[in-house]
Amino acid sequence: MENLLSTVNAILITGPTASGKSALAVELAKRHDGAVVNADSMQVYDTLRVLTARPSKEEMQGVPHHLYGHVPAGAAYSTGAWLRDVSALLPALRDAGRLPVFVGGTGLYFKALTGGLSDMPEIPETLREKLRTRLLQEGPDGLHAELAVADPAMAASLNRQDGQRIVRALEVMKATGRSIADFQGRSGPVIIDAAEARKIVVLPDRAVLHQRINGRFEKMLQQGAEDEVRALLALDMPAEAPVMKAIGVSQIVAMLRGEMTRGEVLEKGAAATRQYAKRQMTWFRNQMDDSWERLTV
C-alpha cells in the first residue's frame, strides 16, 4: 500500500453534489493508507443521513471516516467550528500514519482550510440566541434597520432579507462595538499548506451529472428520506436551522402535509439539486485555480 505522507500533506477533493467525489475519496484513501475527512456542511449533522448523502457503512469500505454526523441537528456549526474540529483531528491522523483525504462540496471549507479564516470574535451565546429569536419572531427588516444605524456601511452591503448575515453583523457589533468588516480582513492560521497538497476538483459532464442527480433523489426516497424528514419535524427545529434547509426537506415536508404528490417531490427535489449543483460548478470554476486537477468521474 502506497503512503503519500512523505510527499504530500493531504488530498483535497471537491466538486458538485452527485459527482462521485466520495467514492473517489475512498479509492484514494485505500490506495494511500488514508482517512476520509468530511468537508460538507450538511453531512456534519446527526440527522438526514440519506438525504444529505452521508456515506453508508458499505460505501466507507472499511476506510476510517471522520467529522460525519457528529453535530446535533439543532446546534450552530460554522466554518470556524469545522476548522477547530479539523485541527483537533489531524494530530491523531498523523500519529497513526494516516493521510487525510478531505472531501465535500462546501467550497468555503476548502478556502478556509488552505487560506485561513477571518479571525472573528467569540459571541456570547445569550446574545446570539436573543438575536436569532428576534429574527424568527420579527423577520429580518427590523434587524436590518437596527444594523443600518449601528453599522451603515455593512447594512448597505447586505441583502435586506438575508437574516443570517444581518444577525451575524449585529452580534459582532453588539459584542465588540466594532464592525464585522474590521475582523473579516484578518486571517487565522493556515491548517493545510495548499502547495504541499494534492488538490482535485471533480467537474462531470452536465448531462451525466443531471442523470445521476435524478436517479439519486429517487433512490433517497426509496431508502428512507421521508422517514428522516418526519423524524426531523418531530424535533421541532426552527425554520432557520441550517439542517432544515437541506435540499429535499421542504419538498418532503410538503408531501407529508398533503400539499405535493410523490411525483412532484421527485421532480422538484431533483430540480433543486440540479440548481444547487450548477451554483457549485460555477463557484468551483471561478474559485479553484490551475493548481487544482480537473477530473471527470
From Swiss-Prot:
<comment type="function">
    <text>Catalyzes the transfer of a dimethylallyl group onto the adenine at position 37 in tRNAs that read codons beginning with uridine, leading to the formation of N6-(dimethylallyl)adenosine (i(6)A).</text>
</comment>
<keyword id="KW-0808">Transferase</keyword>
<keyword id="KW-0067">ATP-binding</keyword>
<protein>
    <recommendedName>
        <fullName>tRNA dimethylallyltransferase</fullName>
        <ecNumber>2.5.1.75</ecNumber>
    </recommendedName>
</protein>
<dbReference type="GO" id="GO:0052381">
    <property type="term" value="F:tRNA dimethylallyltransferase activity"/>
</dbReference>
<dbReference type="GO" id="GO:0006400">
    <property type="term" value="P:tRNA modification"/>
</dbReference>
<dbReference type="Pfam" id="PF01715">
    <property type="entry name" value="IPPT"/>
</dbReference>
<dbReference type="InterPro" id="IPR027417">
    <property type="entry name" value="P-loop_NTPase"/>
</dbReference>
<feature type="region of interest" description="Interaction with substrate tRNA">
    <location>
        <begin position="40"/>
        <end position="43"/>
    </location>
</feature>
<comment type="similarity">
    <text>Belongs to the IPP transferase family.</text>
</comment>
<keyword id="KW-0460">Magnesium</keyword>
<feature type="binding site">
    <location>
        <begin position="17"/>
        <end position="22"/>
    </location>
    <ligand>
        <name>substrate</name>
    </ligand>
</feature>
<keyword id="KW-0819">tRNA processing</keyword>
<feature type="site" description="Interaction with substrate tRNA">
    <location>
        <position position="128"/>
    </location>
</feature>
<dbReference type="InterPro" id="IPR018022">
    <property type="entry name" value="IPT"/>
</dbReference>
<dbReference type="GO" id="GO:0005524">
    <property type="term" value="F:ATP binding"/>
</dbReference>
<comment type="subunit">
    <text>Monomer.</text>
</comment>
<dbReference type="InterPro" id="IPR039657">
    <property type="entry name" value="Dimethylallyltransferase"/>
</dbReference>
<feature type="binding site">
    <location>
        <begin position="15"/>
        <end position="22"/>
    </location>
    <ligand>
        <name>ATP</name>
    </ligand>
</feature>
<keyword id="KW-0547">Nucleotide-binding</keyword>
<feature type="site" description="Interaction with substrate tRNA">
    <location>
        <position position="106"/>
    </location>
</feature>
<feature type="region of interest" description="Interaction with substrate tRNA">
    <location>
        <begin position="164"/>
        <end position="168"/>
    </location>
</feature>
